[in-house]
Amino acid sequence: NSVPTERLRMATLDVDPEASCSKLSTSPSNTSLTHRFLDNKFYLLVVIGEIVTEDHLRCAISDIERGIRSWDTDLISCNLDQELKLFVSRHSARFSADVRGQKILHHRSDVLETVVLINPSDEAVSTEVRLMITDAARHKLLVLTGQCCENTGELILQSGSFSFQNFIEIFTDQEIGELLSTTHPANKANLTLFCPEEGDWKNANLKKHNLQDFINIKLNSVSILPEMEGLSEFTEYLSESVEVPSSFDVLEPPASGGFLKLSKPCCYIFPGGRGDSALFAVNGFNMLINGGSDRRSCFWKLVRHLDRVDSILLTHNGADNLPGVNSLLQRKIAELEEEQSQGSTANSDWMKNLISPELGVVFLNVPENVTNLQPNFRVRRNTEETCLTLQYLNKLCVKPEPLFRTVGNVIDPVILFQKMGVGRLEMYILNSVKGSKELQFFMQHWSSNNKAKTGLILPNGKDAEISFPYLTSISSLIVWHPANPSEKIVRALFPGNAPQYNILDGLEKLKHLDFLKHPVVTQKELIASSAAPTVKQAKLKQWSDSKESLKSNSRPSVGKGVKKDVKEETPELTKPTAVSHQEAVNEKPQKVEKKEKPVVKKERPRTELQSKPEEKDAKAKADAAKQELEEKMQKDEKLKSESKPKPLKEKIVKKEVKAKKPEEKKKEEKDVKKESAKPDRKEEKAVIKKEKVKKEEKPKKEEVKKDVKKDVKKEVKKKGN
């Protein structure tokens, strides 16, 4: 459609940031009002949105009739009855090569230009509305029919939608702004708008957008015009022109055979319209997350080449994510019906319609007591889409599986797929929480559209609200652990429509997982990082042990080993030592306790005679005799010991009880000094030697005393004589 050159005029505009729409401004004072709308020209634009069933079509045709009759126009200047008959007989039709199912019907007379858009795209609607506003006709009528969204009132199209905001944004176009601002106020265009009575359309405040200063707009006026034969012919023809597409038309079969195999982890994000849709796949398993808001499923061109969709995750019950999946379920039901009706005609063309992926498990949180609601063919409601989903799943014998996060500090994953040599796919549920107040309320009042306050304050000072289906939306983290430890661990977060604080609360319970502590990580790197602290601690312990051993080696040898030897040898020391048979007989048995007595330096026993000066000579003689006797005994003892087998060196020292020679004693004293690190052992040896010498000296002292007494008597006699 080429735009006439007279319509293309420049415009200026001011943007109202609060309203997110434009505010037209007049041209400078020196700019003349050059544009003029023609009072005898009329323009009719009818938009028929997406039609799903025959019931939807009947509602749309009824709204078209109401919309045309609400047009406040002069039937004398424009014989509408006659003009509509001319349209039926003389219109032209154009089809789009890019948009399947889109059709544009057009007729232009000297008085009325009529354009009808059937099943158009959002781009086609915006283009035709622009052309209507810029047309020279002063009297314009825009009729928007079809299903609309529940909350916003957006007109649902086969791809996208047309909202009140889209309508306002058209006036921000520079060309349109210049055109309207250069028109004389007495010659302003008149626009009658028939639109859905829902959402933003219903609450539209045109004065807020300053449009009435440049164009006269009437919204959803009551029926003014009478019933007309031409109008009936017009609506009847449109009902015949609009085709309700079958499931195989909405989701076309693949042009070629064969299936697509996804061997590496991947995630496809599809344009889900007002919602979202994605396909996450690994080698051997795939998951479809939501289906988008379009009936013509955005994921179908890829999914139709798969042999199986292993799982479907529907995060919430909404009209923004269920329609795409419902189309897939509807197609699977149509395949069963087609197969039953066609029988065994395997060579027919209908066989290609049966090429579609098999369906696995479906995850969806819905109450068990869901009842079918009365359908509303003008408004697409969340609850109605949920009912359709459950009906289709029931026909396919598929039971939806619920997903909840259990209450606790740790979230256990759901194992979606696990195969030896391939890997493991886990799913952590972040929201919704089992047993929470929000979930309980949703299960009891699932059909309502109640909202909960979030505690957040909007810029306008009001509390932010969120609907319960969104508050209880499933939010999940999917993690792929490949069998090869050198491959990267893949993590994908699918938040659904859950509030951000609920998602963060769920992630807080996963902070202990090591694979979430790195931006990119492999299993091999995780093992290395976890082993590093252990190795470090082992090295520190080894270093401290070696340091302690160095300290102990640098100390004098008074250590535990010497004490241990002494303890082990103590029983040997308690045994009486036999020097000779005669000594053993003469020796009195002594107790063990005597050996433990401290060493005391013994003094020779004094007598009254020895204390006199004249007895010194006798004492010297006695000492000499004693020394000779000891030397003689040592020689005898040495001969005896040499004839016996030599015991261990340590025991020789301990068992040797004979009196040593002066040279040997000196040598022993030197050895003892060298072994000064062994004081305990030295003491014990000294005690043993003293005790044994004491035993030997007892009989000898008696003999010495007798000799001394004899010598003393002899000396006394000599002096007496």
Curated annotation (Swiss-Prot):
GO terms for cellular component: cytosol; dendrite; endomembrane system; membrane; microtubule; microtubule associated complex; neuronal cell body; synapse. Residues 537-721 are annotated as: Disordered. InterPro entries: MAP1, MAP1B/S_N. Residues 562-572, 584-714 have a biased composition (Basic and acidic residues). It comes from the Eukaryota. This is Electromotor neuron-associated protein 1. Pfam families: MAPB1_N (PF23415), MBL_MAP1B (PF25281). To T.californica electromotor neuron-associated protein 2. One of its GO terms (biological process) is axonogenesis. GO terms for molecular function: actin binding; microtubule binding. Keywords: Membrane, Repeat. It is a peripheral membrane protein. Sequence repeats lie at residues 563-565, 654-656, 666-668, 673-675, 681-683, 689-691, 694-696, 700-702, 705-707, 709-711, 713-715. Has a highly basic region with many copies of the sequence K-K-E, repeated but not at fixed intervals. It comes from Tetronarce californica (Pacific electric ray). It is found in: Endomembrane system. Its main location: membrane. Residues 563-715 are annotated as: 11 X 3 AA approximate repeats.
